[in-house]
Amino acid sequence: MTTCAPHTRLSRRGRGENRSSEGETTEKEPSFYTGEGETPPNSTTETPLRQHILGTIHQRVRWEPAFGGARKNAARHLERGAVTPGPWSHLVFDFSGAEFRHTVNLSESYWGAGANFSGCSYRETANLSASVYAAAAHFTASTYYGKAIFRNSVYRAAVHMSGCDYRGQVHAQATVYEAETNLSENTYREGADCTRSTWRGHLNASGCTYRRAANFAECTWGCDVTLAGCTYEKDAVFMSTAFHGTAHMEGCTYRAGAYFSYSEFRGDTDFSGSVFRHDTEFVGCRWRGRADLSGCTLHHVSFEGSSHLGAITFRGTQFSGGRCVFDRSVYAGGINFTGAAQT
C-alpha cells in the first residue's frame, strides 16, 4: 500500500524524510506485502502491523458530517452532500496488489484524490460502504472471499471494477455512480444486491456471470447501459427499474426467473439473441423506444398490461412453456412476429 500526492509516489512530510534530487522533501509510506519476489515478513507481526497502518489511514480519511449530527445517518449525509473530508482525503492512495488477510473496514471514507484497490485479495469481509470517491476509483481484477460491502457510496468520477471475482455476497444497495462505470467480466458466486442504486454515467456491465440471485430492483439508469452477454444462473430481478437511455442486453442467458415487471424503458432496448429458460415477466412495463427481442427463446413469458410506444419485434423468436400472455397491452408502434414460433 502506498499513498502519494499527484505526480509523485511519495507524499506526507515528517519523520523519516528523504530529500529528492529536486530538493523536495518526501517520506516513504509503509507498504503491504504482496508476495511478489519478496521475502515475507514474520507472519506473527505482519498482520497486526498491516491492520494498524490501515486503521490509521481509515481514521484520517473518514468524512465528518458537515453540520454535525450522528454518523448513523450516513446515507442521509451523503445524499445531501453534507460531509467534510478527512485530513488525509486530499492524498492519492495506492493499495494495488495487496492481500488483506483479516476483515477490512474502510467504511465512511472520503477518497478525494483517487484510490487504487486493483488486484487486491480480501480473505474476509471488505466493508467499503458509505464512502465518497471524488476522483477515479480502481478495483479491477480483485478477489473477494468474504462479503463485499459497497452500499450507500457515492462515486463522483470514473469507476473501474471489471474482472473481479466475488466469492461472497455483494452488497451495493443505494449507491450512486455519477460518471462512467465499468463492471464488465465480473463473476458473482453468491448473491449480488444493487437495489435502489443510480447510474448517471455510461455503465458497462457486460460479460458478467451471476451464480446466485442478481437484484437490480428499483434502480435508475439515467444513461446508456451495456449488460450484454451476461449469464444469470438464478433469478435476475430488474423490477420497477427505470432505463432512461439505450439498454443493450443482447445475448444474455437467464437460467432461472427473469423479472422486469413495472419497469420503464425510455430509450431503445435490445434483448436480441437472449435465452430465457424459466418464467419471464415484463408485466406492466412502459416501453417508449423500440424493443428488439428477435432471435430469443422465451419461456412462460408475460407482457400483460404493458404499453409500447415504439416498435417491438419478435422476429425468429421461439416461445415455449405453453404460456405467452399479451393481454391488456398496447402496441402503438407496431409489432413484428415474422418467423416466430410457439413450441
Predicted feature locations:
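N-terminal leader/targeting and pre-domain segments
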Residues: 1-343
